[in-house]
From Swiss-Prot:
This is UPF0313 protein PG_0934. Residues 302-582 form the Radical SAM core domain. Residues 607-634 are annotated as: Disordered. Keywords: 4Fe-4S, Iron, Iron-sulfur, Metal-binding, S-adenosyl-L-methionine. It comes from the Bacteria. PANTHER family: UPF0313 PROTEIN YGIQ (PTHR32331:SF0). GO terms for molecular function: 4 iron, 4 sulfur cluster binding; catalytic activity; iron ion binding. It comes from Porphyromonas gingivalis (strain ATCC BAA-308 / W83).
């Protein structure tokens, strides 16, 4: 039976709601670029519930108006301890603009998808306003925008290097990564009466100090090239990124320092990966799992997408060059207990609009639940950004049995008709030739269960490209694995009398990719009988390897030059190869193949005899039909 929630079950968003709780002031006031949804997938709710669990009174101002007399920033008054600021669940510029730098018409994190409810760079805008209105109140920033912009970074939308967001915003502290552990310690210290300045010794915190007044040196401090040096030398920016990524992926990282202007940014090492008990505690907080009643009658699309889904772990050890997950969540997996997951599933089944279908049981990648190194002492010495590229690490315990057991226990709930896996699946973990027969059997069982029991007719996978040279730059497995997985998908479908579809995702204009590579991609996918729809142009986002290659023109680990399509016309020429089957693109593609000196590819691409409809190895069941674009994980 659905539970009725009184208004006081949510964090207060107005003075009236604070009074209903008997408060005359809040200890902490949060400002968020997203609508307030009280759910563990929405960062402001998580931060608020964590601080509330520490005994603090927390209020939230979602999507404040920054263009009027700033009454939204004043309405709850001055907090006793600090303001917290987050741009929201996405970097605001990714949220607001397309890969072509055009303003998006919709915002999934805003009621009724309105696109005018947040500024560019809310972290900076909100913080500057708060500092102007309440100059003596500390401001702590966090969330993915602040986290991935904590040091000098390339901003695609301004097409230039920007300094760390602390320097731009004037915030007092920055929490990077997932915030539960630093927030717990911040709350404990402030409740104990320690001064705000003492917080600078906490792990996973970044802060500014005047140049020349750096904190007591640590034995292994990592001093980056200054922001100004990076502005004058792109190779230095590339070298900086290499050090940042190495430290981001270490179990026990070093402190990072970078000079900018008259200040130095200090980034303390992160906390160790969360334990199962710690991550359970975060997910088990008393969320209503609903949007705030202020949005009654309005639709928040991001919530609609995830309201019947369950996140079972955090972190990803894939290390994809274009992905920010490992930079923000880390490469070490933090998994929830079965008991915690099953409690959440039970809560979902009791929701009024639940019809028996879980939309996703997954995480950043679908199949990494409870995976870690056999010998953690080896992991603690490791500096590699990926545990599976170029090969699966022999120290990785990639056992799919815990995930299989969890899925089967979920499906035993009598109110569950079907549990889907909507997160992206790592094919390389399923196809790896495990020496341990138990691991091989478990991977095969998971593959079959996935295809037979957990697919809604369409399985999303992300080969991303067909060129092994480009895939190596992406830190993705070779294309032959996609062909192998396609055959396995076909065999399992045939064995069970199913006609499901495989939906591959591809990227154009990734660093290292040429028009010739795109032509080869078109030919290979044609042979596999795919007419691609789920495609995207590469968008540089802060703190990824691919973005550094795009901006600097060098690979940060080798300092060798890397070609990248930068100009709009170059990117469009690559993108059109996805649509070789459209009549209006065919002549353009023919002309382009002549221009790049590869007319020999024309026959392979447009000769009907090369169609894979004559290839008995690829049945119609793998032919994707036209569909609306969906978000995906790498």
């Amino acid at each position: 039976m659905a539970k009725h929630h009184p208004l006081t079950d949510w964090l207060p968003t107005s003075k009236k709601e604070m009074e209903a709780k008997g408060w005359d002031e809040a200890d902490v006031i949060l400002f968020s670029g997203d609508a307030y949804v009280d759910h563990p997938s929405f960062g402001a709710a998580v931060v608020g519930r964590i601080l509330e669990a520490e005994g603090l009174r927390v209020a939230i101002v979602p999507q404040p108006n920054w263009r009027d007399d700033l009454r939204d920033f004043r309405k709850l008054g001055r907090p006793r301890l600090f303001f917290g600021v987050s741009a929201g669940a996405m970097d605001s510029m990714v949220n607001k603009y397309t890969a072509n730098r055009r303003l998006r018409s919709e915002d999934a994190y805003t009621p009724d998808r309105r696109s005018d409810m947040r500024p560019d760079y809310p972290t900076i805008v909100y913080t500057r306003i708060l500092k102007e209105l309440f100059p003596d109140v500390p401001v702590i920033v966090g969330g993915i925008e602040a986290s991935l912009r904590r040091l000098t970074h390339y901003d695609y939308w301004q097409d230039k290097l920007l300094p760390g967001i602390l320097y731009q915003s004037g915030a007092d502290l920055l929490i990077y990564g997932m915030g539960e552990l630093p927030l717990h310690e911040i709350a404990q210290r402030l409740i104990a009466g320690e001064p705000f300045d003492s917080l600078k010794s906490i792990r996973q915190i970044a802060y500014l100090v005047p140049k020349g007044k750096t904190p007591v040196p640590c034995e292994n401090d990592r001093h980056l090239f200054s922001h100004e040096e990076c502005l004058s030398d792109k190779r230095k920016q590339a070298q900086n990124f290499r050090e940042i990524e190495i430290q981001s992926n270490r179990y026990e990282a070093d402190r990072i320092l970078q000079a900018v202007g008259d200040s130095t940014i200090v980034v303390n090492p992160p906390f160790p990966p969360m334990s199962t008990a710690q991550i359970d505690q975060s997910f088990d907080l008393p969320y209503t799992r609903l949007p705030h009643p202020r949005y009654k009658g309005k639709i928040i699309s991001a919530y609609e997408m995830i309201k019947h889904s369950v996140n079972v772990h955090r972190g990803c050890f894939g290390g994809c060059a274009f992905c920010t997950i490992s930079a923000h969540q880390g490469k070490f997996i933090a998994s929830r207990s079965e008991a915690s997951v099953l409690r959440e599933v039970k809560e979902i089944t009791e929701m009024e609009d639940f019809k028996g279908y879980l939309s996703d049981v997954g995480g950043p990648s679908a199949n990494m639940y409870k995976m870690q190194g056999y010998d953690l002492s080896i992991c603690k010495r490791c500096k590699k950004p990926s545990c599976i590229h170029p090969n699966v690490c022999p120290n990785l315990n990639a056992d799919h049995r815990p995930l299989l057991d969890l899925l089967r226990r979920i499906d035993k709930n009598p109110k569950i008709k079907k549990s889907f896996i909507g997160s992206g699946v790592r094919m390389d973990l399923l196809l790896h030739n495990y020496k341990d027969k138990v691991l091989k059997k478990a991977a095969d069982e998971y593959t079959e269960d996935l295809i037979v029991k957990h697919v809604s007719g369409r399985l999303k996978v992300a080969p991303e490209h067909s060129s092994d040279r480009v895939l190596n730059l992406m830190r993705k497995p070779p294309f032959r694995q996609f062909a192998e997985f396609t055959k396995r998908f076909q065999r399992i479908n045939e064995a069970h009398g199913l006609r499901q579809q495989l939906i591959p995702y591809f990227i154009s204009s990734h660093p290292g990719c040429t028009e010739e590579d795109m032509a080869e991609l078109a030919i290979l996918t044609k042979k596999l009988d795919f007419k691609l729809e789920q495609i995207q142009d590469f968008t540089p986002t802060p703190m990824t390897l691919a973005t550094e290659m795009y901006y600097t023109g060098y690979h940060p680990y080798t300092l060798q030059p890397v070609y990248t399509a930068i100009k709009k016309e170059e990117k469009m020429r690559q993108h059109m190869f996805f649509f070789w089957y459209k009549r209006e693109e065919a002549d353009k593609i023919r002309r382009e193949l002549h221009r790049i000196g590869r007319p020999d590819l024309i026959a392979k691409l447009f000769d009907r005899t090369t169609s894979s409809r004559n290839d008995r190895h690829t049945p119609p069941s793998t032919q994707p039909r036209k569909s609306k674009s969906k978000s995906r994980h790498s």
